[in-house]
Curated annotation (Swiss-Prot):
The keyword Cytoplasm applies. It holds the Pfam family Enolase_C. CDD domains: enolase (cd03313). Its EC number is 4.2.1.11. This is Enolase. Pathway: Carbohydrate degradation; glycolysis; pyruvate from D-glyceraldehyde 3-phosphate: step 4/5. It comes from Rhodopseudomonas palustris (strain BisB18). (2R)-2-phosphoglycerate binds at residues 163, 337, 366-367, 388. It is found in: Cytoplasm; Secreted; Cell surface. PANTHER family: ENOLASE. HAMAP family: Enolase. The gene is eno. Catalyzes the reversible conversion of 2-phosphoglycerate (2-PG) into phosphoenolpyruvate (PEP). It is essential for the degradation of carbohydrates via glycolysis. InterPro entries: Enolase (IPR000941), Enolase-like_C_sf (IPR036849), Enolase-like_N (IPR029017), Enolase_C (IPR020810), Enolase_CS (IPR020809), Enolase_N (IPR020811). Belongs to the enolase family.
Amino acid sequence: MTAIVDIIGREILDSRGNPTVEVDVVLEDGAVGRAAVPSGASTGAHEAVELRDGDKERYFGKGVLKAVEAVNGEIFDALGGMDAEQQVQIDEIMIGLDGTPNKSRLGANAILGVSLAVAKAAAESFDMPLYRYVGGTSARTLPVPMMNIINGGVHADNPIDFQEFMIMPIGAPSFSEALRMGAEVFHTLKKSLHDEGHNTNVGDEGGFAPNLKSADEALTYIMRAIEKAGYKPGEDIALALDPASSEFFKNGSYVYEGEKKARNIDAQAKYLAELVGRYPIVSIEDGMAEDDFEGWKQVTELIGDKCQLVGDDLFVTNVERLSDGIKNGRANSILIKVNQIGTLTETLAAIEMAYKAGYTAVMSHRSGETEDSTIADLAVASNCGQIKTGSLARADRTAKYNQLLRIEQELGGQAKFAGRAALKAFRYLD
């Protein structure tokens, strides 16, 4: 019934107009699973490798025909006839077939597309939603959204050094209400920026990209927008940051171009602590650079009991890097990006390891996205309680929010919104 009879890869476009891989997996009973693979702009040095063609005459070298060829050729040859419900074995076969530590031969984009499409095909065959197929009967927690409403760094053409300024509606009673609260703040912020002469065009992830010079200036605008929308900062809606510090860590210092200032490792950790003291910031992602292990240890000791410290480039959804971080006291949370590691099995293993260590997990999109909403289902399947999938603009972002609305409606009275409990491990929310 669930035997794989065909795997079809193709080249499609992501939200930035760059090629990416989409895969259909067809089963013997006619069930079809489809998955499209995202792509990042600020990528960690230790991520699994997405395979690009390198042909400068085509998409400036960013084509993915080699990855598509791997899907339609080697990977299908290896997986044809297998049962789609054998997810772990299927993923292990693809990892072995690739034969490299970072999936660089076949491409993580090829392998992930197949891995996710297999799971979706199996779910379709069993007539189950993906979140239920992957997560079982306990999958019913709707995540708190981290909504990226001001963009900076490599996600926007402006002077702000930090990459993302986010709001988290922790005080909402349901996911649908959290979405409404976030949308109201988003539109209030847009009006405030417009009225003060700022550009209200949006960046890669749907947030505004005004010409502000510092994190303080961006946070002040957001605080005012929360209040103008009728909410209490820190009680109804909290703040979250993604500095993406690896992008501006140079020769042992954090170089703030917008502020025309450099901070050493000690100063960077103290600066983040100061921001947490001045604003209701409950989560900071990549506050230190990916290989600044001493900096990570410092900031974790300094504010780890007051703030969720999320490792993205630090961990790259990799159990080996996560295990090392846990042993050495780096961070207290992991960002989960399926394309950083390249298979569903490895993604779920990273989440499980985080949970066992008392770390939180945040399901995440990439800046180059598609209409694929798989991560919405995976957030519910894993009961991770938090999702980061952009702003309240651009269909590639709202596709995930809309899928979560559907899931909440489908679950009905069984649905549970994570709310403040998503961050219950940290005393500032007790």
